[in-house]
A protein has these predicted regions:
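Short beta-strand segments enriched in hydrophobic/aromatic residues
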Residues: 62, 79, 87, 141-143, ...
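Acidic helix-start/capping segments at beta-turn-to-alpha-helix junctions
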Residues: 72-84, 88-95
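Sec-dependent N-terminal signal peptides
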Residues: 2-21
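Hydrophobic pocket/interface hotspot
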Residues: 58, 75, 83, 137, ...
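Short, low-complexity N-terminal intrinsically disordered segments enriched in polar/charged residues
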Residues: 22-78, 189-191
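Surface-exposed, charged secondary-structure patches
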Residues: 84-85, 93-150
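Short beta-strand edge/turn micro-motifs at domain boundaries
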Residues: 22-33, 136, 154-184
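Extracytoplasmic
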Residues: 78-80, 132, 156
Length: 191
């Protein structure tokens, strides 16, 4: 998200599909996207009880065929109420910028970008640092436009989480960056 760098490169995670260069297949964020109503639901225990569950849900909520609405209600259960999404991207002139969004802004932009498009994102590698109730994850993902199609892009998302004694919460999707020919992913993010 959006939210891996892919989704999130797409958005995303994630993470509103942001790509450094437009290949003609990328999905760009919508500046004036319509507001998406997000119903309040209870979190799924399997999503929030482990770091693996959190990451699995993080990518699943943005993935699906073109005719399937994204799971924004499930997505909202993963985050603290005031979570921020900070997306790193490079414009066509090569200038790198950071864009900060609320969850609602992320959803509005992502939903508009993903509507009517098949998008599948999943984790391929993770670096985890944990100290007590705090965890920092660097999650590498790849995305495709079909569940069995060729990889179209990869990205790295930086997720900060905390354990409240009963469940994990994502407090910040601090950065994600999408791989490009100018910025290939380093080996440590792939194996």
């Amino acid at each position: 998200m959006l939210r891996t760098a892919n989704f999130l490169g797409v958005v995303i995670a994630t993470g509103v599909l942001f790509f450094p260069q437009d290949t003609g297949k990328s999905i760009r964020p919508q500046k004036h996207a319509p507001h998406v109503s997000i119903p309040k639901i209870s979190p799924r225990a399997e999503d929030v009880s482990t770091l693996d569950g959190m990451v699995k849900a993080y990518y699943e909520v943005v993935s699906g065929p073109a005719d399937q609405p994204r799971q924004w209600d499930r997505d909202a259960t993963l985050y603290i109420p005031n979570v921020r999404f900070i997306i790193i991207r490079e414009d066509t002139a090569g200038k790198t910028t950071a864009q900060s969004m609320t969850h609602q802004e992320f959803v509005d932009s992502s939903d508009a970008s993903l509507r009517g498009k098949a998008f599948y994102e999943h984790e391929i590698h993770r670096i985890t640092h944990r100290a007590g109730n705090v965890a920092h994850l660097l999650s590498t993902s790849e995305h495709t436009s079909s569940s069995t199609g060729p990889v179209e892009g990869r990205s790295v998302d930086s997720l900060e989480l905390f354990w409240d004694g009963t469940r994990w919460w994502i407090t910040n999707v601090s950065i994600w960056d999408v791989e490009s020919s100018r910025h290939p992913l380093p080996a440590e993010f792939l194996s």
